Amino acid sequence: QTIKKLSSIPKSPNDQRQYLAITLDNQLEVMLISDPTTDKASAALDVYVGSSNDPKEFLGLAHFLEHMLFLGTEKYPNPDEYQKFISDHGGSHNAFTSLNHTNYFFDIQSGFLESALDRFSQQFTAPLFNADYVEREVNAVHSEYTAKVKDDGRRFFSAIKKTLSNSHPY
């Protein structure tokens, strides 16, 4: 595999961490950060797809898929495997869907990073999308939506969207 180093990363003189940005053969851009003062390791993946990409007949699809990716893979079919592995090794995980991005992330005790990355990457390369969890996750996404629908920032953005042309993506 060929790795292409990207340009250097600007940082504060007080920042003792080491940074390396690379592009893999598959065009995945990766930023590596080394901090020897911590006992944790972490990873994140940002996908350039969010709620603005939802088809009109399937609003909430990006958020729904965010939920479904956590629920088992071909290699790790148990829907609780990823969460259990991360929490059993002192870590946490989460994800969020925004207008143009969906971001998945975790942290874990550094000695378990490689195994965690294997589980993490399987969610994107071989998810199960088990039909047994569809209704539950549709309800979870809907519940999150109804809990946030009255948020002033969201209401403001919704009002702005109403003034835009119907052909505008936002």
Describe each PLM feature range:
Residues 1-32:
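Proteolytic maturation boundary segments
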Residues 2, 72-73, 116, 123-124, ...:
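Scaffold signal of the M16-like zinc-metallopeptidase fold and its non-catalytic homologs
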Residues 34-36:
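Peptidyl-prolyl cis-trans isomerase
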Residues 42-107, 150-152:
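M16/MPP (pitrilysin/insulinase) zinc-metallopeptidase core fold and M16-derived inactive scaffolds
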Residues 59, 80-84, 114, 118, ...:
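Solvent-exposed, polar/charged alpha-helical surfaces in well-ordered, non-transmembrane soluble domains
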Residues 71-75, 107-140:
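M16/insulysin-pitrilysin zinc metalloprotease superfamily fold
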Residues 142-148:
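Short, conserved secondary-structure transition motifs
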